[in-house]
């Protein structure tokens, strides 16, 4: 895209425990979408390195099966906790209860943090599917996800 800032899509690194916590929270949120935040280190330019140090399950303030908004109290708590750990909030995750693990048009419109990673967990089929994306200026780029033993 001409004139658009180029950016590298980091590899999202989750421990097995972090992956299981995210997926469990998504199931716990049914029939609504579930959501939460991710914290980790950033590079000198403010870009997430992809390493996740903390997963913060949150409350979907929308209480909806089709949309999500992380409750502002959860956001403030996560920001404060990440700061005490010398980390930054580096992303948000949410579930799709009836669709694939890809950002919806609403997700893309509401993606306000260009440095963040956007994780979508689809519960549409028997097995959950977790995928990660960068969303900048309406452009969606998929990132690799690596789940390590924990």
Language-model features: where?
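Conserved beta-strand-loop surface patch within small alpha/beta domains used
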Residues: 1-89, 98-150
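Short, well-ordered beta-to-alpha junction loops that form the rim of enzyme active sites
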Residues: 95
């Amino acid at each position: 895209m001409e004139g658009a800032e180029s950016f590298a899509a980091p590899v999202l690194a989750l421990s097995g425990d972090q992956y299981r916590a995210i997926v469990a929270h998504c199931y716990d949120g049914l029939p609504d979408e579930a959501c939460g935040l991710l914290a980790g280190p950033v590079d000198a330019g403010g870009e997430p390195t992809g390493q996740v140090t903390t997963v913060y399950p949150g409350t979907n303030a929308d209480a909806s099966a089709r949309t999500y908004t992380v409750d502002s109290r959860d956001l403030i708590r996560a920001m404060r906790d990440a700061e005490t750990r010398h980390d930054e909030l580096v992303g948000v995750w949410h579930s799709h209860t009836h669709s694939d693990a890809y950002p919806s048009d609403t997700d893309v419109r509401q993606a306000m943090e260009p440095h963040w990673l956007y994780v979508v967990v689809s519960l549409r089929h028997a097995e959950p599917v977790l995928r990660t994306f960068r969303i900048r200026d309406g452009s969606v780029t998929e990132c690799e996800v690596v789940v390590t033993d924990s």
